């Protein structure tokens, strides 16, 4: 058994704006990850000003929670010029760690904020223990494993001394290794590695055969009349396998979704909070899992998959028939206050 298993795992939730930040903490997250207005790979989220980040750090710390700030772009020279002051400001805000993927960004962070812990982003595609060892020796204190890792690789990475392991348990997945896809840049001029991905992989694609002498007469190979979604990933959901996920030795269980709604954040965090607590008390069961899985299905989602945890064929991680998200429930309202049995919505 992995020796790190005895540590109470952290439930880490996304926060795309202030409302989602409060929602995540209220429903049981131990920590949140968020981004400033730049450098955070979610350019279309509301994100946070430095003053807001400082407030969030103080608020979270009062409740014994943590705040991690993403600075996980793949930087160019212009970015590097602005990063020293920005990272220094994040350190002064009280951030508990930076999530980084670029070696240059990491070097700057170590120079201007040497006491600020560095977490290696999943964008860096760390898939094995030797790579994790390399990044640890470079100054990283936590590895956010690539979503493509299998169980055995995660166990080996978690066993590495002086370096923690964080794994994703829920949320959207990419058809490529994170950060390695150029479809968005090619088709729209918006770079995924700058936080502007348009998710071109989820568009309706057509495969065709074209004869050299007759380029104006392509033969389309359609799955049906709507086309085929050959690169459309399902959503990760490890709810039914949460006990097994804990057996990897990961110290942090991460939920994807900084671009998702407050309803999504609250529902998913609440479900995994209850599931994780049940695992830690020995009361997690199929009936508990099934009930919480039904809660998760009330949020906007695509067909679920356990990803690569146990090794999966391509057709078990992709949805070839539709890229549309579904939900088994309807969002009604947010409760703003509760007093004397009356809710303000």
Where are these regions (language model features)?
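Conserved nucleotide-cofactor-binding alpha/beta core module
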Residues: 129-130
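Beta/alpha (TIM)-barrel catalytic core signal, keyed to glycine-rich beta->alpha loops juxtaposed to Asp/Glu
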Residues: 125
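Glycine-rich, positively charged N-terminal anion/phosphate-binding segment
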Residues: 42-61
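Conserved phosphotransfer cores of two-component systems
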Residues: 113
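Surface-exposed amphipathic alpha-helical tracts and adjacent flexible/coil segments at the periphery
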Residues: 1-26, 31-34, 38, 56-57, ...
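Alpha-helix capping/helix-boundary segments
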Residues: 104-105
